[in-house]
Amino acid sequence: MKKKILVSRLYPKEGIRLLEKENFHLTLWEEKRPMTQVELIEKAKSHHALLCTLTEKIDSHFLTQCSHLEIISQFAVGYDNIDIDAATGFGIPVGFTPDAMSEATADIAFGLMIAVARKMFFLHKTIINGRWGYFNPTGNLGFELKDKTLGIFGLGRIGVKMAKRCKN
């Protein structure tokens, strides 16, 4: 019998393919909204495992209704939404992906840094509102990041990745 996994969100296709390759039966929630807890409980009742995100509340109420689950794992760095003590009490192991979003988060931070330095948000709004007028080289360029010092608060996974992007 194939093990059934409830996937509560649209996940990267590579991950879905890996699970399908291992012969799991996947039920994918494809709506562009999170499941309500009632929907989550009803769907999880017929599955062996749950693959979720931070928006699903996995509390003692959920776990009491779905104590048959063999594992819960979530695509997120943290797991504040999961009652670990209750899951442990039901003998359900919980997994998470501590480095899943580090590269993307560092990329976004890097992009935001450039966008702010070069006034991209302001200039985008100016263009959208039809107020572009003329190009002002001294007023519209913002400032160069070259030879600037970057302060990074914390050198965890994301801070280190950001530092490597900004090195030299």
Predicted regions span which residues?
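An N-terminal-biased, well-structured beta-alpha scaffold segment characteristic
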Residues: M1-G95
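Glycine-rich Rossmann-fold phosphate-binding loop(s) that bind the pyrophosphate
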Residues: L155-G156
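Aromatic pocket-lining residues of Rossmann-like dinucleotide-binding sites
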Residues: C166
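Phosphate-binding beta-alpha-beta segment of Rossmann-like dinucleotide-binding domains, i.e.
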Residues: F90, P98-T149, K161
